[in-house]
From Swiss-Prot:
This is GTP-dependent dephospho-CoA kinase. Pathway: Cofactor biosynthesis; coenzyme A biosynthesis. Pfam families: DUF359 (PF04019). The keyword GTP-binding applies. GTP binds at residues 48-49, 67, 69, 126. It is an enzyme of class 2 (transferase). Its EC number is 2.7.1.237. GO terms for molecular function: GTP binding; kinase activity. Catalyzes the GTP-dependent phosphorylation of the 3'-hydroxyl group of dephosphocoenzyme A to form coenzyme A (CoA). It catalyses: 3'-dephospho-CoA + GTP = GDP + CoA + H(+).
Length: 178
């Protein structure tokens, strides 16, 4: 099984937002980006807190990618429970920190090819999951993820954004997992 590993030289680059940074928190961020979310082909949420506030604001993402952590610490039970309230397909995958496993990549691709809202629960870390979400999402989709201690990032999926993500993924180190 193939694993993409984040090289040291990409770490600083990926700390920069991939889309528009909304300097706000919680439902306020969702409200500020709501026109884009309503117009989006699909809505993808990456991260437990991002997913929580989208659900709280009554936006049901087509795909939610969570790891039950925020800033490397477990999320509160109330946040986990909010995720469980919906009726959607649940997929469990492994994805160690600083990587994108083939298992996660396949789960994102398959989820975005389907019609059923899906929650991917990552054992490990989902920090890089916005990359395949952008790559595999239909054009016109919105990918939302948190920028720790700053706000939320909204990425509208365009052909140019997909090419940018392909370039980033090509620069990651490929390893074979036994």
């Amino acid at each position: 099984m193939r694993v993409l590993v984040l090289p040291e030289e990409l770490r600083d680059e990926l700390k920069e937002p991939l889309g528009v940074l909304y300097r706000c928190h919680g439902v306020e961020c969702v409200e500020r980006m709501s026109d884009h979310l309503r117009a989006a082909e699909r809505v993808i949420a990456v991260g437990d807190i991002t997913t929580f506030y989208l659900l709280k604001a009554s936006f049901i993402p087509d795909l939610m990618i969570v790891d039950h952590k925020t800033k490397r610490s477990p999320v509160e039970d109330s946040i986990k429970r909010r995720h469980l309230e919906g009726s959607y397909r649940v997929v469990n995958v492994e994805n160690p920190a600083g990587t994108l496993t083939e298992e996660l990549l396949d789960a994102v691709r398959e989820s975005l090819n389907g019609c059923t809202p899906t929650e991917i629960i990552v054992d490990g870390e989902e920090d890089l999951a916005a990359l395949p979400a952008i790559l595999y999402a239909p054009l016109g989709s919105a990918v939302v993820y948190g920028q720790p201690s700053v706000g939320s990032v909204l990425v509208m999926v365009t052909p140019e954004k997909k090419r940018e993500i392909e370039g980033i993924l090509r620069r990651m180190t490929v390893k074979e997992k036994v």
